[in-house]
Each structure stands twice: as C-alpha cells, then as structure tokens.
C-alpha cells in the first residue's frame, strides 16, 4: 500500500498469514527477510550502485535456487511517481547512490497460483564518514509468525528487535491501550 501526500510519497508492503504457515512458507519468508535486512544494514562505499545491493538481497533465496523477477528496489518520487529514477536496486542499475535519495527495499518470492511474499520499506540514503548506509523510513511491523528464528543470526535478530522497538516507540503514543498491546507483541 502507499499514498501520495503534499509532503511526500509512501510505499510499503507486508505479507501476513491468516492461518498457520507451512514450514516451507516460513523458510522462504525468512530468506526474503534476511535479504531485506542485508539491504537495510548495508555499509557501502560512495562508489557502490544498486546492482551490488541487489546481489545481497537475493543471496539467501539463490542459495535455495529461488529468485524473484523484479528489482529489489526503485527510486521513490516526491508527490509525482512512486517508481522514479534514476536510482534503483536492481541487476541492471549502475547509478551511484547519493545522500538524500529514497529507495524501496522490497525483496520477495512468488509461487504462481500458490502464494506471494514481499517485505517492503522505504529507505533513505545517508553518507556517514564517506560510507553509504540506509535509514528506514517505514514503520510497520513484520509478521513474526512467518519467521523461522532458528535461521536468523544474532545480527539479524538484533536488527529485527531494534526495528520493532523503533516502530513501537515512534507510533505507540498515537494508539489506544489495546493497539499498543498488539504492537508491543512484535518486540
């Protein structure tokens, strides 16, 4: 989902499951999540492009001979087009990332006529000490019922905890007691 606002454009995707997910779906969701985290935590030099990051996002799926047929991310416009360049995270993109750019981070996997998985956040490109890194702009919880936590390393578990804590600390003040309790369950 997403929207156009006078002060910016949003784009976010979450996969949720309304029944008990199979182990296969949990495993694939976790590979996608690991790719998503790999992008979000990338520490790049100032000459790196979206192509290098795309490889990181696909790594865990490719180890299982799985992939997705779209770029990992696209540039996001400001009250114009949601998909806007020249920056993107894809196999073909050779544009150097620069501070101030906004991109999506949206690896996924799709099994035709069966299921689809995508985790999408918007990320802001920052330059810190001549390194490129990303700041998450999207604050929406990730369904923990779909995660195989045994497949996450300590860094990935820490990232997920910190992300959910930031989501809670940022938006809980706008929520009812019941909504806060639900949101706290992701931490």
How should each PLM-predicted stretch be described?
Residues 1-187:
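Active-site neighborhoods and metal-handling regions in enzymes and metal-associated proteins
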């Amino acid at each position: 989902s997403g929207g156009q606002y006078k002060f910016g454009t949003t784009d976010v995707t979450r996969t949720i499951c309304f029944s008990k997910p199979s182990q296969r779906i949990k495993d694939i969701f976790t590979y996608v999540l690991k790719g998503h985290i790999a992008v979000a935590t990338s520490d790049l030099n100032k000459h790196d492009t979206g192509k290098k990051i795309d490889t990181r996002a696909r790594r865990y799926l490719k180890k299982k001979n799985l992939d997705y047929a779209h770029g990992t991310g696209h540039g996001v416009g400001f009250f114009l087009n949601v998909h806007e360049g020249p920056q993107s995270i894809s196999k073909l993109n050779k544009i150097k990332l620069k501070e101030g750019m906004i991109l999506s981070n949206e690896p996924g996997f799709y099994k035709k006529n069966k299921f689809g998985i995508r985790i999408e956040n918007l990320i802001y490109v920052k330059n810190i000490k001549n390194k490129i890194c990303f700041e998450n702009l999207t604050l929406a919880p990730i369904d923990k019922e779909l995660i195989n936590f045994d497949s996450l390393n300590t860094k990935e578990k820490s990232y997920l905890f910190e992300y959910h804590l930031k989501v809670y600390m940022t938006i809980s003040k706008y929520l009812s007691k019941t909504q806060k309790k639900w949101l706290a369950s992701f931490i």
